[in-house]
Every structure is written in structure tokens, then in C-alpha cells.
Amino acid sequence: MAKLQITLTRSVIGRPETQRKTVEALGLKKTNSSVVVEDNPAIRGQINKVKHLLTIEEK
């Protein structure tokens, strides 16, 4: 399976609680933090919900 590197590029300050929890569920804590995750439909759904806050690269 492919892997995705996800970076939180914008702050969650002032964002709805659902978006904050989604960012936390992806394993991101601070701005500019990154994680590498497996590419699957569940992760894609989470990314789609907060894509305006993230930068995604395929690894």
C-alpha cells in the first residue's frame, strides 16, 4: 500500500471541534508537525474533512 505524508500547515485555532478532533485523530498536534500514514479510505475521508489545513505528499 502507498503511504502519505501529512503536514499540518494551518492552525486549528478558531476551527470547529469536529475539525480539531479529526486533526488529532490523524496524529497531528502542532503546526508544521508531520506523520506518515497508510493510504486507505478511512484516512482519505479524514484528510478530505480538513484538507484546507493540510499539505499531503505521496511517499
Swiss-Prot record:
One of its GO terms (biological process) is translation. Keywords: Ribonucleoprotein, Ribosomal protein. Pfam families: Ribosomal_L30. One of its GO terms (molecular function) is structural constituent of ribosome. Gene3D superfamilies: Ribosomal protein L30, ferredoxin-like fold domain. The keyword Zinc does not apply. One of its GO terms (cellular component) is cytosolic large ribosomal subunit. Disulfide bonds: none annotated. InterPro entries: Ribo_uL30_ferredoxin-like_sf, Ribosomal_uL30_bac-type, Ribosomal_uL30_ferredoxin-like. The keyword Ribosomal protein applies. Belongs to the universal ribosomal protein uL30 family. Part of the 50S ribosomal subunit. This is Large ribosomal subunit protein uL30. It comes from Staphylococcus epidermidis (strain ATCC 12228 / FDA PCI 1200).
